[in-house]
Amino acid sequence: MTSTYPIALVVGSNRRESLNRKLAKAITRLDAPTLRFQDIRIDDLPMYNGDLEAARPAEVNRFTDEVRACSGVLIVMPEHNRSLPAVLKNAIDWGSKPADRNVWRDKPVAITGTSPGAIGTAVGQQHLRQIMGILGATVMGGEAYIGNKPQLVDEQGSFADDTTRAFVQAYLDRFATLVGKLA
């Protein structure tokens, strides 16, 4: 019998019409029978402040409890100024504190994203990989930079072209294998 693993789906954007939210939706529509995606909100988290660690806000507890309950994390992010978005870095910081409650440690993490710039999310993903590695996450090797095309995702929320669909499906299959090995 094949297990099904809950996967925290973290979209590193707080825009309502985010390209990455659309990308995330298309990813969840792919064939991944062993993965069950849970959309984890990060836009309601207060800015990280060490003074709040002792009496953590309810939104922070909700976020960390949801991530902790998942077998892996898929982060879908834009790139801001050649790095990761502040809203995502804030969520990562809350998830890592205090150190003995770090939700990222030993957690399988896959990273992808799209941005309108010429190099997409290449530099931002490298920054995120470095941060997640320092926090003890098991970051899946290989890159998944998704070029932003006018028709990346169709009106039904699926990938508009077979090449992108096949590429992302292969990446998702590798992630499912990693999660299965580490869960």
Regions found by a protein language model. Give the residues of each.
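N-terminal beta1-alpha1 ligand-phosphate binding loop
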Residues: 2-33
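Glycine-rich phosphate/pyrophosphate-binding loop and the adjoining helix
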Residues: 2-4, 8, 138-183
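A generic structural motif
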Residues: 32-38, 137
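Short connector loops at secondary-structure junctions
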Residues: 38-47, 144-151
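N-terminal beta-loop-helix "entrance" segment that forms/cooperates
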Residues: 42-58, 155
